[in-house]
A protein has these predicted regions:
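Active-site neighborhood of HAD-like aspartate-dependent phosphohydrolases
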Residues: 1-46
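An amphipathic alpha-helix signature
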Residues: 24, 28, 45, 49-57, ...
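Substrate-recognition element of Asp-dependent hydrolases with the DxDx(T/V) motif
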Residues: 27, 94-124
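Helix-loop "lid/cap" segments that line or gate small-molecule binding pockets
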Residues: 30-31, 51-65, 122, 154
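Short helix-capping segments at alpha-helix termini
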Residues: 32-38, 62-65, 103-104, 127-131
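Metal-dependent phosphoesterase signature
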Residues: 57-99, 104
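Substrate-recognition "cap/lid" segment bordering the active-site pocket of phosphatases
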Residues: 86-89, 115-154
Length: 154
């Protein structure tokens, strides 16, 4: 029998929440603003949790170098903020998993590369995150995932 864990940390995008459609919708809006073809869900699905840089790279392809990437990121984040939880859902079994951790008095938290202001906008949409003990966002500490600082700061 395994010992009871002292705590559990989860990633957010692509682990607890399926945010791919809302992230992809923001990407496609930015592409539309620049008269670029939209990007299919099947193309961006596995890239969505890589954040704005990865999405812009797949959406703009070789033409990304023709643009100010920081301006594109700002436009992307502005649009994503407006529609942060339209199609986002928790993955199957997550509510039950978190409820079980809570029932067993196992503290749990989230370590994400999503900026804090977006994390704080998104999490309240999901009741299952009410018992979350700690949230470390991409800009909470000096280093973000995959650097171990987020884990070692616990």
């Amino acid at each position: 029998m395994l010992d009871k864990p002292k705590g559990v940390l989860f990633d957010l995008d692509g682990t607890l929440l399926d945010t791919a459609r809302d992230l992809g919708n923001a990407l496609n809006w930015v592409l539309q603003q620049h008269k670029m073809p939209s990007c299919a869900f099947s193309v961006y699905r596995n890239i969505a949790s890589d954040g704005s840089q990865g999405l812009l790279e797949i959406g703009f392809g070789d033409r990304l170098a023709d643009y100010d990437v920081e301006s594109l990121k700002a436009l992307f984040l502005e649009r994503y903020e407006k529609e942060i939880c339209v199609d986002t859902v928790s993955f199957n079994g997550i509510k039950e998993l978190l409820a079980r951790l809570d029932k067993d008095n196992i503290p749990w938290g989230i370590v994400t590369n999503k900026p804090q202001w977006l994390t704080e906008l998104l999490l309240p949409h999901f009741d299952e995150f009410a018992q979350c003990q700690v949230v470390i966002s991409g800009d909470t500490l000096e280093k973000r995932k995959p650097h171990p600082l987020g884990l070692s700061s616990m």
